[in-house]
Amino acid sequence: MNPRCLPFLVFALLGLVTPGSGAEVQATPLRLTRERTFLTLTGGTLPGPVTIHYIEAYCRPGSTHQDWRTETVIPHQSALIAARPDGSEVVIRDTLSDGVVVEHTITARADEVDFQIVARNPTERESPAHWAQPCVRLDRFAGANKADAQSLVPPYARQCFLFIDGQMTRLPTEPWATEARYQPGQVYCPAHVNRNDVNPRPLSPLVPSSGLCGIYSADGRQILALAFEPYQEIFQGVITCLHNDFRIGGLKPGESKTIRGKIYVVPADAKKLLDRFERDFPEQARRPASRPQKS
């Protein structure tokens, strides 16, 4: 190489990684792997792996006040149908004990995970499958100690948010519910869902105006956010987790329903996140919280 060219080469290489140059080195895409009933999300700008219990449970109505294991949960079996070698997509099929089949196509992209879900009832009996729980574990993203998860308001909850009357609202919300069949935790029931049909943890009187919820990273520079359409509840859980649980609403014989969802891993710009969410979920865009359904 001509020595006179060396300074120009060094300058060009530096230009590739100069912040704001428009030619920055890009983060690797997000990647999905699956083991048993757990998805693991890695890559991108994540500070560490994010584990998702997918699906933790399929649930019957009446769940707010009844025994979780014996009355609410519908047993199911889960099978991996396909997985791309590069971790960009997995297809999962869940078969519920009443015969309902739920197929999930889950695609990882640069800064999001997309969920396309089809629930169908091939039987001649109506199914009570009303909602389902993807449980997103956030301890590594939030820099949280899992030992604190059973606190009344665990430290990681203070990094969490949802939207009330269209405004980002940080937890703990006021008032903070404390009474329920099981404690602790905090459940937020949207106006379109019967308040008898959510998680049997403390139920907030506050009504979310959309399903968008999330958490700030330990350094405050990123947001991991969740959304499904339709959704059943938002739940700050008891294992350093956050839920935006999706709604099925029961299935008549031969009926099929579609659900879609997103996980976003984005810079901590709340306005950009909300704008993107409203493009992806126009059904929930700036939807005012109406009166909740009566218990």
Predicted features along the sequence, with ranges:
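Positively charged n-region of N-terminal signal peptides that target proteins for export
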Residues: 1-5
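Bacterial N-terminal signal peptides
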Residues: 7-17
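Beta-strand-rich recognition/accessory modules
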Residues: 23-24, 84-85, 93-95, 183-293
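Acidic-aromatic substrate-binding/catalytic surfaces of carbohydrate-active enzymes
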Residues: 24-80, 89
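Extended, loop-rich substrate-binding clefts of extracytoplasmic carbohydrate-active enzymes
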Residues: 63-110, 128-130
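Residue-level recognition of well-ordered beta-strand positions that form the cores
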Residues: 93, 105, 116-120, 135, ...
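Acidic (Asp/Glu-rich), glycine- and aromatic
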Residues: 108-165
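Low-complexity, serine/threonine/proline-enriched polar segments
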Residues: 150-198
